[in-house]
């Protein structure tokens, strides 16, 4: 009887229902993996695995280019980006392309160029992927030893890690150069409601940059997500880029120490699990950043944050009722607390009502009205500018919430009908993807550790019930 699994099997495998679905060198008998296990068949075929990864990169870049052009084609300059379901153009606008004062889009040509460049890049990657998957050498070790590798070769693995770190560092510096020399980036805090500007006075103080990492993640602290000026963000990228490049050089030049050799599992599946774990962390951090941070993700493009929409509603009604003659400093609400203004636990003057829970919100349209002790009553009575009223009314009606009832005091039933904030999309998608990647991390880590320890969980193939059943065909 033909065995449907490799005798030298290191992984639990599934049986093929149809033995003809095989490619030479990539069939189940040679690799221990069925056709549907995808890249697992290529674990020891470095050339073919390269093809799979390059083709995958091509698909990713093709999506980016095609979606970019789709958004440009559908873009209406008269409406805010966040009303149009856009998720790519806000990123380009944040980088300072095509926008002017107040986040107004003045030129869509840079967006078009971005889309076309990504499409062209995807064609190059697609060709490379097909070439290496079908025509190139199956393994790179013999012909191109620099690009070849064996998973157990610890020194080679850390060299590859080092190269990746250097590339990440260069990526961080690309943002720095854009902000410093190539037109600047969009600063939502620029006076009068935001503008594109070059960053001139970088924050490089390690106590400031690494102070963010030491902050509590709760309340007014907010860990790294609390960053609210571009000097700190760009300065942080200088530090990150430098650390990545220096760490990359270190990993290329050194071999793993004995404790590292003992601590880690050195196999392809182990590296996959480490990567998935890192991506899960990225996903969770990105989720928090896009949900709470309105500096790295300006509200002009992504819509207001939840707290921002709630505070904007309180501000809008304060403005309205003050015009109608209300004394906003002393009016009481139904609970006996201040209707429009009250004090926070630490004594600052804050907005009253249900939005009190968001009292530590910082937003460019609100900060000019604060004094040393919170909101300044004199400024609220005399200094409110038309652009602040317009922006808060706009944000009040575009909360990133899909609830049919009030959330944080914001009436959301209108929004649930025909508006989903890009913040909701980006935060939810990154949380869900981060969670799936984390589960994948646990799964592959468990398998890699089991294989390294010399045992695996799986069905004993010799007594598998399906072997005694009539074949499907």
Curated annotation (Swiss-Prot):
The keyword Oxidoreductase does not apply. The chain crosses the membrane at residues 69-93, 134-155, 178-200, 255-275, 291-312, 447-471. Its main location: plastid. Disulfide bonds: none annotated. Signal peptide: none annotated. GO terms for cellular component: chloroplast thylakoid membrane; photosystem II. It is a multi-pass membrane protein. Gene3D superfamilies: photosystem ii from thermosynechococcus elongatus. Pfam families: PSII (PF00421). Residues 1-14 form a propeptide. One of its GO terms (biological process) is photosynthetic electron transport in photosystem II. Keywords: Acetylation, Chlorophyll, Chloroplast, Chromophore, Manganese, Membrane, Metal-binding, Phosphoprotein, Photosynthesis, Photosystem II, Plastid, Thylakoid, Transmembrane, Transmembrane helix. The keyword Glycosyltransferase does not apply. InterPro entries: PS_antenna-like, PS_II_antenna-like_sf, PSII_PsbC, PSII_PsbC_sf. [CaMn4O5] cluster binds at residue 367. It is found in: Plastid, Chloroplast thylakoid membrane. One of its GO terms (molecular function) is metal ion binding. The modification N-acetylthreonine is found at residue 15. The modification Phosphothreonine is found at residue 15. Binds multiple chlorophylls and provides some of the ligands for the Ca-4Mn-5O cluster of the oxygen-evolving complex. It may also provide a ligand for a Cl- that is required for oxygen evolution. PSII binds additional chlorophylls, carotenoids and specific lipids. Belongs to the PsbB/PsbC family. PsbC subfamily. One of the components of the core complex of photosystem II (PSII). It binds chlorophyll and helps catalyze the primary light-induced photochemical processes of PSII. PSII is a light-driven water:plastoquinone oxidoreductase, using light energy to abstract electrons from H(2)O, generating O(2) and a proton gradient subsequently used for ATP formation. PSII is composed of 1 copy each of membrane proteins PsbA, PsbB, PsbC, PsbD, PsbE, PsbF, PsbH, PsbI, PsbJ, PsbK, PsbL, PsbM, PsbT, PsbX, PsbY, PsbZ, Psb30/Ycf12, at least 3 peripheral proteins of the oxygen-evolving complex and a large number of cofactors. It forms dimeric complexes. This is Photosystem II CP43 reaction center protein. The lineage of its organism: Eukaryota, Viridiplantae, Streptophyta, Embryophyta, Tracheophyta. The gene is psbC.
